Amino acid sequence: EPTSHLDLPNTIEIMQLLRELAQKTKKAILLSTHELELTLQVADKIWMMTSEKLKTGLPEDLILSGDLQKTFGTERFRFDETTGGFRMNYPANKEVSIQGDKGVSYYWTERALLRNGYKITENSPLWININGDGKWILHLNTHHQEFYTIENLLFTMSEWESKFLSE
């Protein structure tokens, strides 16, 4: 593992250098690593060893076939085929709906909500509108409030649940 004791920027640098070296010299470089998310971005071929067998293929083919999820997924986390990363499976005991822009703000809002025990549903009385310009609007019945950070949004959601939804 050539990068096992390096910080992230240096790990990325080494992986890029190894890829460039392999391309320039037309030689294969075989390495062992636990940096799976990074490997998916730089490897031309992956060899995955399980207790049953060896699976090989392009990173994209191993993802699309479901082999990465089967090999690395557990009850507590899963491999997300869309992002190429791992996602924690958080227990959800609250519901919220999200509407609006499906861009970067949506992704990070959803991630924060899941981490804080929310299940994203279609028709929750508690819902968030994301307008894409750094503003979130929280709605519950006749109540609504604007936010400019996810932290403040989450804080108010917790307050509203105690005040309005627990009645």
Identify the function of each model-found stretch.
Residues 7:
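ABC-family nucleotide-binding domains
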